């Protein structure tokens, strides 16, 4: 199993709208991609009036990650309205091989 994460930040005033946007885009895309085992959106307020977003997803294999992200799966995937919200963004994603889990 593969874990994938990405990080970005928006103005806290835009956090609810951006969360709704991620629900409609990235989270739906995760859920509809074969091999996805779940996705989570994490948030926290940070200094400077920003809210940080982390998307975290689990995948059956790197082939499943490629089906979502493309051949260069390390590059973050963005959607048309992301520029409207994001004031910080990681351009790449982190990936880990899951070697132990307490869940099924």
Regions found by a protein language model. Name each.
Residues 15-17, 64-66, 102:
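Intrinsically disordered, low-complexity acidic/polar segments
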Residues 27, 53-55, 91:
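Residue-level detection of beta-strand scaffold positions
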Residues 40-51, 77-104:
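Glycine-rich beta-strand-turn "strand-cap" elements at beta-sheet edges
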Residues 12-38, 75-82:
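Short amphipathic alpha-helical segments
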Residues 1-3, 13, 90, 99:
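Intrinsically disordered, low-complexity segments
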């Amino acid at each position: 199993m593969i874990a994938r994460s990405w990080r970005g930040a928006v103005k806290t005033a835009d956090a609810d709208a951006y969360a709704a946007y991620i629900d409609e885009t990235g989270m739906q895309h995760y859920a509809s991609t074969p091999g996805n085992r779940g996705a989570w959106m994490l948030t926290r307020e940070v200094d400077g009036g920003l809210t940080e977003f982390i998307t975290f997803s689990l995948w059956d294999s790197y082939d499943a990650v490629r089906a979502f992200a493309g051949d260069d799966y390390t590059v973050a995937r963005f959607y048309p309205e992301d520029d409207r919200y994001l004031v910080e963004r990681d351009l790449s994603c982190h990936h880990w091989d899951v070697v132990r889990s307490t869940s099924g």
